[in-house]
Amino acid sequence: MSLLKERKPKKPHYIPRPPGKPFKYKCFQCPFTCNEKSHLFNHMKYGLCKNSITLVSEQDRVPKCSKPNSSDPKQTNQPDPVVKPTSSKPVPSGLSHLDAKLQHSLAKDDIKENLDLHARGPHRCLGQKPTPHKEAAPPSPAPEAAVGTQPVLEGAVRPSAFVPVGEHRLKGQELTETPEALALTHAPAKASSFHTKSAFHAPGYPWRAGSPFLTPEFPHKIPSTKGFGATSPYVHPSITEYPPHFYTEHGLATIYSPYLLAGNSPECDSPLLSVYGAQDQRHFLPHPGPIPKHLNPAPSTYDHYRFFQQYHSSLPIPYGFYRPESAFSSYGLRLPPVAGISRDQSSHLLEEAALGYQALSPSKLNSSNSHKKHTELEKQSPTPEAKEPSKDGQRDTEGTKMSPRAGSAATGSPGRPSPTNFTQTSQPCAGLCGLSDAPASSAPGRIPPPEQGLAAFKPIKKNTEHPHSQAPENRAVSPKSLEALSTDAPTQLGSLEAAPSSPEDGSRAAPLNLSTKPEAEPAATCSPAHGGFVEPQDAPLNLSVKDPCNALTSRPSVCSPPRGAEPAAAPTPSPTQQREPASSGDGPDPSSVEAPVPSPTGKAQDIRAADSDEQKQTAAVALCQLAAYSPGNVEPAAQEPTCRPDAPTPRAPESQEAQCDLRPKGQKRTSPREVGKGQQGSKKAKPSDTARVFTLRKRTRVS
């Protein structure tokens, strides 16, 4: 009968309202009252009431007791008086009364809820045992007094969240609850309560939370309930056992920290340990228990495999120490550090490799361009020297920065070798160095680069009127820029380009003021700009779409802006316009600047540009080398393009401005196309432009 009734409330989770007694049940913390506990139960269960489901489950025992009470309220009450002495007196009596309760269907409801509540329920029931005896008479005081009496009895103060309106029910329910709680408190009852509770709500956690409470509460409540005295030893052993497993597994926790952490271990002990074969481990763990962190990880590790469990006591020491070390170092320590280090190191190593490629690529390029070698060595070598230290710093910084970024596409390849690694090599060398030089101005840098390209061509404009007059100046600038390049490659890059930017402004303001003196001024401005703008715009130029090498190219371009102008100017003003818009599309892109030059100087530069393109060296490097190695060539080329860019100059500045401005956005691709148009005369420039465009893209990503 009790079982049937017990199951009935379990299935519907509500008890039919007691007959003839309106609002028999009251929510523990709410003014809600109802004849059907299910309403209040759901009220609390779903958090409508402040009582937690745990409290609800604890307190539902009593409502279920009331439930039987409603069916047999007097019968329940009868067992309750018996239960009072029983609960206060012998656990066996509590058990017998518990059986009676089960028969009375108090047991059915109580057990159902008690199982849920036994995590806290057992000790709370304990607290309630004396409390019900004391407070059974006053139903309403009982809950409050019970709460005050036992803080642990948050919900247990009132056996149920739903307090029966009648005192007799309160007494009977609480008392009956207590015996049931006592009975359930027994190991078997607890086990069932844990299972039921875990099924009902996460009881395992509250149970452990309650377990500590049970432990202290048991001493208090043991006198009132001997059953708990018996249970307390049970609980204590379980708790004490778990810490050893806990610690033992804790050793594993180091390896399997996500699974077994001190915080998780209490709950994880039984489930995880059972999973890990903790039972076998329990037997062996007590032995290695003192060494759990060292030995147990190995046994634990093996426990998963159930391999050395037999040998835990004997083998675990050598294997335990050895295996845990390897496991911890390789897994616990190495993997996270290795992951991070491998990322950082891999990024560093890749960056170093890139540096090696960078250093090697300039060297290779230098060796390949023996005549350019000295110039490039002057420029690149100091740049790698100056840049590599800064890049070393940056490598660490970017290694740190890039290691996370390395995974991201944006910075994906900055420090790493790539098919265009040499271009990137120049980029990392000059670009990273330049970035390190003026990382703060990187944002401005991107904007200046368009100016850079504009500047390169606008100096070309200035050169345009007086190509010859400025040609020497370009010469001077180019050697200066080369020297400055070798001196401050990244800085000079920015400064040269920056200087053109200022001349560019001047040329824009007065493109007609390209008289020799103004031209000289722009040229001089270019060289002074190298010194003056070097650092400020250095970074912006480096950050510009151009590679630092492109910046170098711009520098030669600035030094001999004619290159950009050369390609455009040499063929014809209209081709110049085409090319210059193309090159302006390319902006400073030295590749278009290099290749397009149809003039013999332009051709020579084109050849050299082709060489640099072939070597995937940034055209900037080749241009710098060309400018430094044969400033005369640059000069004639500069002069020729300087003369012709005049016509394109107006368009070139505009297109350059627009395209250079756009280039950081998306004109890079357009630049190669336009460059292709303008570079019809020289197709090799296209490859360099394309490579440069890629380089620029990569640089943009880097920046």
UniProtKB/Swiss-Prot annotation:
> Which Gene Ontology CC terms are recorded?
nucleus
The cross-references to InterPro entries, in alphabetical order and at most eight, read: ZNF750 (IPR039363), ZNF750_Znf (IPR039064)
Q: Name one Pfam family in it.
A: zf-C2H2_7
- Single GO molecular-function term? zinc ion binding
Q: Which residues bind Zn(2+)?
A: 27, 30, 43, 49
Give the subcellular location: Nucleus
Q: Would I find Oxidoreductase among this entry's keywords? A: no
Alphabetically sorted, this entry's keywords are:
Activator, Differentiation, Metal-binding, Nucleus, Transcription, Transcription regulation, Zinc, Zinc-finger
Q: Biased composition, Low complexity: where in the chain?
A: 79-93, 583-592
- Sequence segments annotated as region (Disordered): 60-96, 121-147, 362-617, 633-703
UniProt feature, compositional bias: Polar residues = 67-78, 418-428
Q: Where are the zinc fingers (CCHC-type)?
A: 25-51
Q: Where is the composition biased (Basic and acidic residues)?
A: 375-399, 605-616
Instruction: State any GO BP term from the record.
Output: positive regulation of transcription by RNA polymerase II
> What does this protein do, in the record's words?
Transcription factor involved in epidermis differentiation. Required for terminal epidermal differentiation: acts downstream of p63/TP63 and activates expression of late epidermal differentiation genes. Specifically binds to the promoter of KLF4 and promotes its expression.
Q: What is this protein called?
A: Zinc finger protein 750
Q: What is the lineage of its organism?
A: Eukaryota, Metazoa, Chordata, Craniata, Vertebrata
